[in-house]
Every structure is written in C-alpha cells, then in structure tokens.
C-alpha cells in the first residue's frame, strides 16, 4: 500500500469523493503543511497555524496509480482559487499536494502541467514535501457518511460526488 496526501478545500469533500474510489483502502481527514505541532480544528481555522485541511489516502497502486489519484483531485476542487473553495475561505482551504517522495513530487508537477490545459486561470496548487500529517478529530472522520442530511453535505459535498460519478473512474462496489 502507498499513501498520498492532498488538500483541496474542506477535507470532508475530498474524503467523501476518495472513499468511493476503487483501490483506495482508507481516507483520513487531517492537517498538514503548517508550523505548529498537534493542531486542532479551532487553531487551524484561526489561520494562525498555517495548516491546510488535507486527506491522507492509503491506496493499492496495483489498482489505482498516484497519477490517477491526482486526476481525481483536479475534478474534486478548483485549483485556481487561492486560499478558497466556494464559500470556504482561508489559508486552511488552499490547494496543496504534500508529497511523500521525489517520485510523487515529479508526478505532481507533471499532473499540474496536464491539468493546466483544462483551466482558463492559472493553477495555484502548492507542491511541498510532507513534513507531518495530523489526523483531525474523530467527529471529522467519515463526515459525509455519518451526516448525509446535513446542509453542507447536501449542497457542497454531494455535487462533488456527483461530478466524480460522471467521470467514468471506477467506483467501489457496495460494501467494499
């Protein structure tokens, strides 16, 4: 199994999309790319820690490649808006790829170039080495699955899931 860490707005959105993808073993919402140790949601939302809301994805590279994970990333958020996704505004919502290896860095940079062909505005996604990943509090994990009737889930997360379903990427079978 390999890992990928990505930030593209609220971690609930990326978590919900990647949990559907065949070859993804687990998705953990958390914080990365900041300056303080052991951040919590309140401190991250204050903007003082420098962390981004991210997801750490454990995947089977025999089923899905890192490059394919990045392709899903580009359709799951707007990488052209700085420190913002829709109404979610702040440094914690920035688009970022904290890479785990030099090979991931290379693929991230190639993926940005390829994705840039599909956006009219420049991509502002940061690419930097993952120094530390801190899992978010338990109530943030599996958010869409445990709160499907919550308004944010209905109006923000569900459209991103629907967009993913239209791509033709493989979706996990029910119960897997």
UniProtKB/Swiss-Prot annotation:
Q: What is its EC number?
A: 1.8.4.11
One of the GO biological process terms: protein modification process
This protein's source sits in the domain of life called Bacteria
Which residues constitute the catalytic centre?
A: 10
Q: Does the keyword section mention Oxidoreductase?
A: yes
Keyword Oxidoreductase listed? The answer is: yes
Q: Give the catalytic activity.
A: L-methionyl-[protein] + [thioredoxin]-disulfide + H2O = L-methionyl-(S)-S-oxide-[protein] + [thioredoxin]-dithiol; [thioredoxin]-disulfide + L-methionine + H2O = L-methionine (S)-S-oxide + [thioredoxin]-dithiol
The molecular function terms in GO held by this entry are: L-methionine:thioredoxin-disulfide S-oxidoreductase activity; peptide-methionine (S)-S-oxide reductase activity
**Which UniProt keywords are present, listed alphabetically?**
Oxidoreductase
Family, as annotated: Belongs to the MsrA Met sulfoxide reductase family.
The protein's role, per its UniProt record: Has an important function as a repair enzyme for proteins that have been inactivated by oxidation. Catalyzes the reversible oxidation-reduction of methionine sulfoxide in proteins to methionine.
- The molecule here is called Peptide methionine sulfoxide reductase MsrA
Per the UniProt record, the source organism is: Leptospira borgpetersenii serovar Hardjo-bovis (strain L550)
């Amino acid at each position: 199994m390999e890992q990928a860490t990505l930030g593209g707005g609220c971690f609930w959105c990326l978590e919900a999309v990647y949990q559907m993808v065949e070859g993804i073993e687990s998705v953990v919402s958390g914080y990365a790319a900041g300056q303080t140790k052991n951040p919590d949601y309140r401190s991250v939302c204050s903007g003082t820690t420098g962390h981004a809301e991210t997801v750490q994805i454990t995947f089977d590279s025999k089923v899905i490649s890192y490059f394919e994970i990045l392709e899903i990333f580009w359709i799951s958020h707007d990488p052209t808006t700085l420190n913002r996704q829709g109404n979610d505004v702040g440094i914690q919502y920035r688009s970022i790829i904290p890479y785990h290896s030099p090979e991931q860095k290379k693929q991230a940079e190639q993926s940005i170039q390829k994705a840039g062909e599909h956006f009219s505005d420049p991509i502002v996604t940061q690419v930097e080495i993952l120094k530390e990943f801190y899992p978010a509090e338990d109530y943030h994990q599996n958010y869409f699955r445990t709160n499907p009737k919550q308004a944010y889930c209905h109006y923000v997360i569900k459209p991103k899931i629907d967009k993913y379903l239209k791509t033709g990427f493989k979706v996990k079978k029910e119960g897997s």
